[in-house]
Amino acid sequence: KTFTRCELVQALRRQGFDEAKLRDWVCLVENESRGRTDIVGKPNKNGSRDYGLFQINDKYWCSNTSKAGKDCNITCSQLLTDDITVASKCAKKVYKRHNFMAWYGWRNHCQNKPLPDISKC
Protein backbone atom coordinates (compact mmCIF):
# COMPACT_ATOMS: atom_id res chain seq x y z
CA LYS A 1 0.00 0.00 0.00
CA THR A 2 1.11 3.53 -0.72
CA PHE A 3 -0.33 6.14 1.62
CA THR A 4 -1.17 9.64 0.47
CA ARG A 5 -0.20 12.29 3.00
CA CYS A 6 -3.72 12.59 4.42
CA GLU A 7 -4.26 8.83 4.53
CA LEU A 8 -1.01 8.60 6.44
CA VAL A 9 -2.07 11.31 8.90
CA GLN A 10 -5.35 9.49 9.54
CA ALA A 11 -3.62 6.12 9.94
CA LEU A 12 -1.06 7.56 12.38
CA ARG A 13 -3.84 9.21 14.39
CA ARG A 14 -5.66 5.87 14.57
CA GLN A 15 -2.46 4.30 15.89
CA GLY A 16 -2.31 6.89 18.66
CA PHE A 17 0.76 8.82 17.54
CA ASP A 18 1.28 12.08 19.43
CA GLU A 19 -0.49 14.90 17.57
CA ALA A 20 2.29 17.35 18.48
CA LYS A 21 4.83 15.15 16.65
CA LEU A 22 2.61 14.13 13.74
CA ARG A 23 4.29 16.40 11.19
CA ASP A 24 7.66 14.89 12.13
CA TRP A 25 6.31 11.36 11.68
CA VAL A 26 4.78 12.28 8.31
CA CYS A 27 8.07 13.85 7.21
CA LEU A 28 9.98 10.78 8.39
CA VAL A 29 7.71 8.33 6.56
CA GLU A 30 7.65 10.40 3.35
CA ASN A 31 11.45 10.50 3.31
CA GLU A 32 12.13 6.93 4.46
CA SER A 33 9.57 4.92 2.47
CA ARG A 34 7.66 7.45 0.31
CA GLY A 35 4.58 6.20 2.18
CA ARG A 36 4.96 2.59 1.01
CA THR A 37 4.36 -0.31 3.40
CA ASP A 38 6.01 -3.00 1.25
CA ILE A 39 9.45 -1.46 0.86
CA VAL A 40 12.69 -3.23 1.87
CA GLY A 41 15.76 -1.03 1.70
CA LYS A 42 19.01 -1.94 -0.01
CA PRO A 43 21.57 -3.45 2.38
CA ASN A 44 23.17 -0.87 4.67
CA LYS A 45 26.97 -0.65 5.11
CA ASN A 46 26.78 -3.15 8.00
CA GLY A 47 24.71 -5.58 5.91
CA SER A 48 21.48 -4.88 7.77
CA ARG A 49 18.28 -3.85 5.99
CA ASP A 50 15.35 -1.53 6.71
CA TYR A 51 11.72 -2.60 6.41
CA GLY A 52 8.34 -1.09 5.71
CA LEU A 53 6.67 2.27 6.17
CA PHE A 54 9.06 3.39 8.94
CA GLN A 55 12.13 1.61 7.49
CA ILE A 56 12.86 -0.27 10.72
CA ASN A 57 16.24 -2.00 10.86
CA ASP A 58 16.74 -5.76 11.23
CA LYS A 59 20.00 -5.44 13.16
CA TYR A 60 18.19 -4.55 16.38
CA TRP A 61 14.44 -4.42 15.95
CA CYS A 62 13.03 -7.28 13.87
CA SER A 63 14.03 -10.82 13.00
CA ASN A 64 14.66 -11.62 9.32
CA THR A 65 13.91 -15.31 9.95
CA SER A 66 10.44 -16.83 10.35
CA LYS A 67 10.82 -16.71 14.16
CA ALA A 68 9.80 -13.44 15.84
CA GLY A 69 12.58 -11.78 17.80
CA LYS A 70 14.89 -8.85 18.56
CA ASP A 71 13.72 -5.76 20.42
CA CYS A 72 10.25 -5.48 18.87
CA ASN A 73 9.77 -9.25 19.08
CA ILE A 74 8.48 -9.48 15.53
CA THR A 75 9.55 -10.79 12.14
CA CYS A 76 10.60 -8.17 9.62
CA SER A 77 7.89 -9.37 7.23
CA GLN A 78 5.31 -8.18 9.78
CA LEU A 79 6.57 -4.65 9.02
CA LEU A 80 5.55 -4.98 5.35
CA THR A 81 1.79 -5.42 5.72
CA ASP A 82 -0.88 -2.87 4.78
CA ASP A 83 -2.08 -2.96 8.39
CA ILE A 84 0.44 -0.72 10.14
CA THR A 85 -0.43 -1.71 13.74
CA VAL A 86 2.70 -3.83 14.33
CA ALA A 87 4.98 -1.39 12.49
CA SER A 88 3.58 1.54 14.48
CA LYS A 89 4.13 -0.18 17.80
CA CYS A 90 7.71 -0.97 16.86
CA ALA A 91 8.37 2.56 15.52
CA LYS A 92 7.15 3.99 18.83
CA LYS A 93 9.58 1.70 20.64
CA VAL A 94 12.46 2.91 18.45
CA TYR A 95 11.37 6.51 19.08
CA LYS A 96 11.14 5.99 22.83
CA ARG A 97 14.72 4.79 22.89
CA HIS A 98 16.39 7.08 20.35
CA ASN A 99 13.94 9.85 19.46
CA PHE A 100 13.78 10.70 15.73
CA MET A 101 17.61 10.57 15.60
CA ALA A 102 17.32 6.84 14.83
CA TRP A 103 16.19 7.72 11.29
CA TYR A 104 18.56 9.27 8.75
CA GLY A 105 15.58 10.27 6.61
CA TRP A 106 14.37 12.45 9.48
CA ARG A 107 17.83 13.79 10.34
CA ASN A 108 18.62 14.74 6.74
CA HIS A 109 15.25 16.02 5.58
CA CYS A 110 13.15 17.00 8.61
CA GLN A 111 15.35 18.09 11.50
CA ASN A 112 15.37 21.92 11.70
CA LYS A 113 13.60 22.07 8.33
CA PRO A 114 10.07 23.03 7.30
CA LEU A 115 7.75 20.11 8.08
CA PRO A 116 4.89 18.94 5.83
CA ASP A 117 1.61 20.82 6.00
CA ILE A 118 -1.10 18.53 7.36
CA SER A 119 -3.65 21.25 8.16
CA LYS A 120 -5.95 20.08 5.33
CA CYS A 121 -6.10 16.50 6.64
Curated annotation (Swiss-Prot):
Its EC number is 3.2.1.17. Keywords: Antimicrobial, Bacteriolytic enzyme, Disulfide bond, Glycosidase, Hydrolase. It comes from the Eukaryota. It catalyses: Hydrolysis of (1->4)-beta-linkages between N-acetylmuramic acid and N-acetyl-D-glucosamine residues in a peptidoglycan and between N-acetyl-D-glucosamine residues in chitodextrins. It is an enzyme of class 3 (hydrolase). The keyword Cell membrane does not apply. One of its GO terms (molecular function) is lysozyme activity. One of its GO terms (biological process) is killing of cells of another organism. The keyword Flavoprotein does not apply. PROSITE patterns: GLYCOSYL_HYDROL_F22_1, GLYCOSYL_HYDROL_F22_2. Lysozymes have primarily a bacteriolytic function; those in tissues and body fluids are associated with the monocyte-macrophage system and enhance the activity of immunoagents. PANTHER family: LYSOZYME C. Belongs to the glycosyl hydrolase 22 family. This is Lysozyme.
